[in-house]
């Protein structure tokens, strides 16, 4: 149904359209919004921020060119998704374009003001990294959303910080932009030229067309590494250079690993490199559990990668479980993290007991074994670290002033247990108290990063060249990479044929 505009007599124009409810039966009703402004432009559409009338609720409206002969896959998938950590589609409607027979699909979604990428870039400008407790909070919610998504057979295929919306007031993270998502069916081929380059799983680079949802786990590992490092872990300049960057860190894949990634791969010459110990990839103060979790996601063999919910059960997230009554800096409680639905409890029932909160004071945190801590990125045993080997391969680690010019200090609740391996160091001198997240993103312990860290993060924008945006937030619902356009068009991936009846 085409949109209709009505002038309400107010200063700002109110647009009224006939829209369809996103969930349940196709019930159509009039909705009205005002104060629409463009917050993002992408290869396949424009995103507006608007205010609903009369509720004043803020929404994001993603407008994409639609071919009426096809069903838009993004719409079909979003209508099936209901999860606390996935952006909610509220309504959809069609509108006419300037050209004859030009029709646009408009997706009306909930609005969140920030993205993980935007927050990450703020830290990079201040030569800081995101405090580890925010890494913990945000990565948990990302993995939980992926566990739900994958259980339905859907693969996101474009996991990256730009597609993770944040509300700093509530601490909520929501996965967005399902323009590249697809239901993967065993035996049916899919294009390999998908996913933004820096987060693209190696099996995709090696041309696999029968990949699984484990490509999303690789992307999540890249995101977590980026948050810990303050810069991209694999900053490839091209598709081929991307695998070179991966090999530099993880070593040359074995013939068995190549077969696991793509049984039909025709081998070309790769540089013969040995893998680095994970402890040398990250900074000395990076928590051992964080490094261990990354090592379980960034694995060449797709089936060896941890599942999303097993990732949520990892000891890195035990601090969330040990005290579920922690508070955000504004005094609010943490967002719901353990309100698993009856459906979620059936996804991996054996894992569920590991996901639930533990009694405060219980000693359930598992320290990664010494043997595992000393494995390299290929999972092989590495020599014990010497004093010299404890120096990080990346920029030197030090406390550094925040934007206000004052040294950043950690609240008492952010004391870290010294695991005795050089990766965890005690911060502060106060007794341990219930963990309280910092006053704001810049008020917590944060580590200095290299001078080029922001440029490294910026490359993800400039290189892809896929959007223009106002740093206002929800534009990220249309972050679709030009790096993927060709593949999307050739895949039959973005649309499904409309039923004739």
From Swiss-Prot:
GO MF terms held by the record: ATP binding; protein serine/threonine kinase activity
Phosphotyrosine modified-residue sites: 193
Active site: 158 (proton acceptor)
Gene Ontology cellular component list: cytoplasm
Stored Pfam families: Pkinase (PF00069)
SUPFAM superfamilies: Protein kinase-like (PK-like) (SSF56112)
Catalytic activity: L-seryl-[tau protein] + ATP = O-phospho-L-seryl-[tau protein] + ADP + H(+); L-threonyl-[tau protein] + ATP = O-phospho-L-threonyl-[tau protein] + ADP + H(+)
Domain Protein kinase: 33-317
UniProt-listed Enzyme Commission number(s): 2.7.11.26
UniProt biased composition (Acidic residues): 451-471, 482-501
Biased composition (Basic and acidic residues): 381-390
GO biological process, one term: male gamete generation
Post-translational modification comment from the UniProt entry: Phosphorylation on Tyr-193 is necessary for the activity.
InterPro entries: GSK-3, Kinase-like_dom_sf, Prot_kinase_dom, Protein_kinase_ATP_BS, Ser/Thr_kinase_AS, STKc_GSK3
Top enzyme class: transferase
Annotated positions binding ATP: 39-47, 62
Region described as Disordered: 355-427, 446-501
This protein's record includes keyword Phosphoprotein: yes
Family: Belongs to the protein kinase superfamily. CMGC Ser/Thr protein kinase family. GSK-3 subfamily.
Protein name listed in UniProt: Putative glycogen synthase kinase-3 homolog
Originating species: Drosophila melanogaster (Fruit fly)
